[in-house]
Each structure stands twice: as structure tokens, then as C-alpha cells.
Amino acid sequence: MRYGICTGIENAGLVKKLGYDYIELSVTKTMGLDPAAYAAGKKALEESGIEAECFNILFPKTMNFVDGKTTSLDALEIYLEKAMAMIADLNGKVVVFGSGKCRTCPPEVKYLDAYENLVKACRLTGEIAGRYGIRVVIEPLSR
């Protein structure tokens, strides 16, 4: 059995020291770092010898790709290219497609329309992740 922990990239050294096998980083938080903080975090990750194998929180709460109006497929594609490039840059292998708020069907949207939009978003996510050699795992959320 292997153990990982969800935390920020700046904690890579501590995670290794505590005996964890890997670190799980937030996509949105890591993408939100300024260039200097990102570089420092990447250096800390490399120096610690711990791997950032898995990433969570793929999408920011401001996105919604099931309602058909908040986030276009074009905007989603641009975002995913940046996200997957960052994950690959940190040698990530897996990203969790959770992000419940982004895939919540608003009451005014027909369920079938929301479902079709979600399928499009999942396919696009998988296609882009595949180009970077990243596996997408879907978190089974029920709300």
C-alpha cells in the first residue's frame, strides 16, 4: 500500500520527511501561483525526491460546463491545455475529475442537455489529458 497526502507544493519536503509516498496537488491552486512561487515549488518538489503523482480540483468553481452558457468548450479547451501542461511539467500521472460545482445541473437546465454538455467536457478532458500521457479518473459525486 502507498500513502499520499493532499497539500500544497510548498510542503513537498515536509511530506517526504513525514514518510508519505507521494503528494497530491490541487490543479487550481498550483496554476494560481505566481511564476516565482511556482518555480520555488517545483524546485522544492525536485529536491525532496517526492513525486506529485496525482492532482485534484481540476476546475475552478467559476467554471460550469453543464449549463451551456457559463464556460464555452473553447474556453474549456484553453484552460485544459494550460492545466495538463502544468501537470505534465510536474510529472503528474493522474488527475481527478471531481469539481462538483462545475458539473452541477442548475434547476433551469434540462437534465439531458446538462448530461450532453458533461459528456462533451469529459471527452475533451480525456483527449487533452491523453496528449500529455495523463490519466483522468472521475470522482463519483452524487449531488
Give the ranges of each region predicted by the language model.
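Active-site acidic/histidine proton-transfer and metal-coordination neighborhood
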Residues: V66-R143
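Aromatic-lined carbohydrate-binding surfaces of glycoside hydrolases
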Residues: I57-M63
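Conserved beta-strand positions in the central sheet of alpha/beta enzyme cores
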Residues: Y22-E24, C54-N56, V96, V137
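Acidic (Asp/Glu)-rich catalytic clusters
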Residues: A12-G19, P35-N56, K82-G92, G126-Y132
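Acidic-and-aromatic substrate-binding clefts and catalytic sites of carbohydrate-active enzymes
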Residues: C6-G13, S26-A40, M63-F65, R103-P106, ...
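Histidine-centered beta-alpha loop that forms part of the nucleotide-sugar donor binding/catalytic region
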Residues: G8, I57, G100
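Short, glycine/charged-enriched secondary-structure capping and boundary segments
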Residues: L18-Y20, A37-A40, G68-K69, V109-L112
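Extreme N-terminal starter segment of soluble prokaryotic enzymes
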Residues: M1-Y3
